[in-house]
Every structure is written in structure tokens, then in C-alpha cells.
Amino acid sequence: MRTLTGTGPDLWNHDGGPWGVSDLVGNAWDWVSGIRTFNGEIQVIPDNDSAMNVDESPDSPCWRAVLEDGSLVAPGTPGTLKYDAVAPGTDSPEDIGIRGGYRLNTEIVNFNYTGHEEDISHRAYGWNFFRDLAPAESVTVPQVLKLLGAAPAPGGCSDDSVFFLRNYGERIAARGGSWFDGPWGGIWELYLRETRAFIYPDIGFRSAWADV
């Protein structure tokens, strides 16, 4: 079944009412601000400052990494949380998927891509169900990552939402899945596979009206 954007019943809106947000799941991936990965390290813009007109460029000083206790620190600080691949990566220059998924870790044991191509935008990637994203042994996942939807909350991710990632280079977040995903689209679906220059028919964004 197909529906036009925003034309579903009120029950499909986030609050079940006529003024709720529609199409949070499916339709198109939504680019979101304030969260990214850089070489697998999870980085955020603190205090919801990304809702303002702040610098979110690749080298912005606003980005912060996350420690196990939830502290926000400078990117590259030892012990910050990262998305580490479970399976070894590949040096193949092809855009191939690597099975095994990811774990939250304080170091990167396995990058998806281990080659030396200058353009790393579309090399190897991985995926797993978001609910299966677990910490490595002895690693603590802070509440802030669960609140940001960057790590699953216990008992809160029962659907088949998928987590996609390339844990090398800068990757910008999109959420919610698209019409391509079918039953795997879900509210927890998180897409950290592409660069900020990526364009595709099933990736969009949510605009906001501003009185200027």
C-alpha cells in the first residue's frame, strides 16, 4: 500500500492526533543535525545547540565526544565511545556489506574498510538490528547515548529497526528509514553510512518555518 506524504490517518502521527508529526517512520530518511561519527567515534552537539544556527562543519569546535560516564569531551580524547565492527574489515575498494554488526567500544578494533583509497565515501559498510547493538565487555553505555537514540534502551527497541554504518571518515546521521526498507524501517532506525555530500531520492529532511 502507498500513501502520499502526510496523508495517513491521525493514528499514524507521533501523538495519534491531528497536529502530530507524520511519517517519522518510512517515507524518506530524515537527515538530522547534532550527531555524527568520525572514524567511528560518536560525536554530538551539546545542550540541543544544534537547534540553533551553530557551526556543524567538519572541523567545528562545537562537536563533543562521549565518555562512559556521560561526560562530553573533545573529540579524540582517549576512552570515548565508538562503534567498533565485530568482524574484521576489508581492503577491497568495492562497496560491500560486512556481516557481524557492531558493538559499542572505547576503541576501534575493526574498521570496515582497511584499504588506502583516497576517496573513502563508498567503501565497505556493515549493519545489524539496532536492538542488537551491545557494549563490548566491561564497557558502560551512558544514559545520554540512549536518550539521543545512539544506543538502544533496554526493552525499548522491540522492532526490526536497522542500524547502518561505515565506521571510518565522517558520517552524518539520518533516521526513520525509507520506502526501500519495508518491514525493517522503524523509529529506531539509524543510518550513519554516508557523507554530508550524499544525495539520493529516499533521503530528505524536515524543514521548519521561521519568521525572518
Where are the predicted features?
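C-terminal, surface-exposed recognition/capping segments
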Residues: 6-7, 15, 22-24, 28-36, ...
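Short, low-complexity, polar/charged sequence segments that are solvent-exposed and flexible
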Residues: 49-51, 193-194
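Flexible gly/pro/ser-rich segments immediately N-terminal to CXXCH heme-c attachment motifs
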Residues: 45-47, 53-57
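A short, polar/charged loop-to-alpha-helix boundary motif
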Residues: 38-48
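Internal maturation/activation junctions in enzymes
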Residues: 1-5
